[in-house]
Amino acid sequence: MIKEVIVVEGRDDITAVKRAVDAEMIAVGGFGINSKIISKIKEAQKRRGVIVLTDPDFAGEKIRSIISKRVKGIKHARISQSEGTKNGDIGVENASPESIIRALNNAKCETQKKTYEFTIEDMLFFKLVGNSEAKKRRDLVGNELGIGYSNGAQFLSRLNNFGISKEELINAVNTVNRRYYDEGI
């Protein structure tokens, strides 16, 4: 049983998550998110904590952002686009139970105070920008860290906002390098 309440977009997502874990859930109804639902999420955050698990697409990130701005201290769980895609449809409802469990286990909380641990130079060094493989590497490393895929600037911001340490990034990059590129740092 997961202690936190899991916030998802819709009923199909609830079904998929229930196949993976035993947890209380709140469905926001996509962009139908309103003050009543936000109040429910705030109450859940006070009582047990909240993990937001939205679709790995623009709409999912927008919903995640709306919730994050209104409810402080929530955790973010993410599945990759490849894990959430089936027959051209992207969503949590398409993810395997294993992918959902991995995402929930890797859920990260945004830090209240932004750190400046990482710079663009780190992104270049780890080939996360300025490289023909950068987009793929950000997807793989982001998945490994549990912060999801994003463009270079947003990825740098997530590294700093989620309190990722240099050691965590190095371990994730090494895992990706060994798994997909047959090399290490």
Curated annotation (Swiss-Prot):
Highest taxon listed in the record's lineage: Bacteria
GO molecular function, one term: rRNA binding
Main location group: cytoplasm
Note on cofactor: Binds two Mg(2+) per subunit.
SUPFAM superfamilies cross-referenced by the UniProt entry: Toprim domain
Keyword Oxidoreductase applies: no
Reactions the enzyme catalyzes: Endonucleolytic cleavage of RNA, removing 21 and 42 nucleotides, respectively, from the 5'- and 3'-termini of a 5S-rRNA precursor
InterPro entries the UniProt entry points to: RNase_M5, RNase_M5_C, TOPRIM_dom, TOPRIM_RNase_M5-like
Compartmental location: Cytoplasm
Cofactor (UniProt): Mg(2+)
Residues at which Mg(2+) 2 binds: 55, 57
GO CC terms in record: cytoplasm
GO biological process, any: rRNA processing
Enzyme Commission number(s) of this protein: 3.1.26.8
Task of the protein: Required for correct processing of both the 5' and 3' ends of 5S rRNA precursor. Cleaves both sides of a double-stranded region yielding mature 5S rRNA in one step.
Similarity-based family: Belongs to the ribonuclease M5 family.
Protein name as catalogued: Ribonuclease M5
Source organism (scientific name): Clostridium acetobutylicum (strain ATCC 824 / DSM 792 / JCM 1419 / IAM 19013 / LMG 5710 / NBRC 13948 / NRRL B-527 / VKM B-1787 / 2291 / W)
Gene name per UniProt: rnmV
